[in-house]
Amino acid sequence: MARMLLGDVNVDRIEVASARVSEGEKDAVRMICRYAESVGKLDRVEVLGFVDGHKSIDWIDECGCRVLNLLAKGSLKHCTHQLKKTPEEHIDDIYRSLAYAAQKNMLVNLYLEDWSSGMKDSPDYVFQMMDALVESGIKRFLLPDTLGILNPIQVLEYLGKMKERYPSTHFDFHAHNDYDLAVGNSLAAVKAGVSGLHVTVNGLGERCGNAPLASVQAILRDQLHVDTGIREDRLGEISRLVEGYSGIAIAPNQPIVGENVFTQVAGVHADGDNKDNLYCNDLVPERFGRKREYALGKNSGKANIARNLEELGLELTPEQTRRVTQRITELGDRKEMVTQDDLPFIVSDVLKYS
């Protein structure tokens, strides 16, 4: 998957693991880093680490990874309740981690975990952290909506404040989908001026997941005219690969990658496609390595049937087409599934008794 994401799909960066999880995870990260180094892409592989003295940094260094995504606290409550430290103590700990990472020749990005709650409840703490760290050599500040609590209006407001106060700083936005707003919030983040977005294949992630790669890519290209360099024709393939390895099925109606999203059911839509593509938008299936299909059922109509017959190389008279359509409608009324593979047998049966 790492090879395909970095090579075929051409994402900018991949965060592949959390430090100190297991020996199996460590072996996997080593393999990914060896591959990435062999193709000159080691700087695009990142590992999540913690403010835990030297432990995470040593673990990541032993894997051969050169980019640390350091997890710090982005809300006062997280700092004082979870770490049981003052902001000043936490900042000192971060600086010690930065110094040790520099000794290991490691690039550091910084997560401000629970940043969204921090901006709502303790913005002075967020700005205290940023003021202390903005000139520290951290390459990117990663701003997560950890609990998925923001809406696009709030994203514009809070990120606008960050960009206004720190205009030359590279910010990434990391959305969670608890309110089904991860994609919308990611769009708002780009409008607010962030430089990077965190997405996952199929939207997989904690709880309700994160913003899905395919959906965000389509919006960036079509709505904001942003060229990300992503190979859209490989998105369907990586989606199926992740579905298989994760065991988490893709919803049939999930935009871009779902099984049914390029299937026309209503006959009037198929008829419109035959007449100057009246029911098509910019999300054409070929763009994503897919093809349009026309469902067979009681709502199909003659246009859908004709499309499927044409794909199979079958030619029927108007009367024969009418009878085939009638038979498919009858099967649909009985809730029976009709596929294109069934169509030759239905045609044969109709012709036999006509």
Task: Outline where the language-model segments fall.
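Alpha/beta enzyme core
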Residues: 1-13, 34-40, 53-109, 113-169, ...
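Catalytic alpha/beta core domains of metabolic enzymes, predominantly
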Residues: 147-150, 157-275, 279-281
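General structural feature for long, well-ordered alpha-helical segments within catalytic domains
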Residues: 1, 24-28, 56, 89-93, ...
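N-terminal active-site wall of soluble small-molecule enzyme domains
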Residues: 20-40, 45-48, 52-57
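A mid-to-C-terminal "edge-of-domain" accessory segment
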Residues: 225-354
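Short, ordered loop/turn segments at secondary-structure junctions
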Residues: 18-19, 50-52, 72-75, 113-115, ...
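Short catalytic-loop micro-motif centered on adjacent basic/acidic residues
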Residues: 14-18, 44-47, 142, 172-174
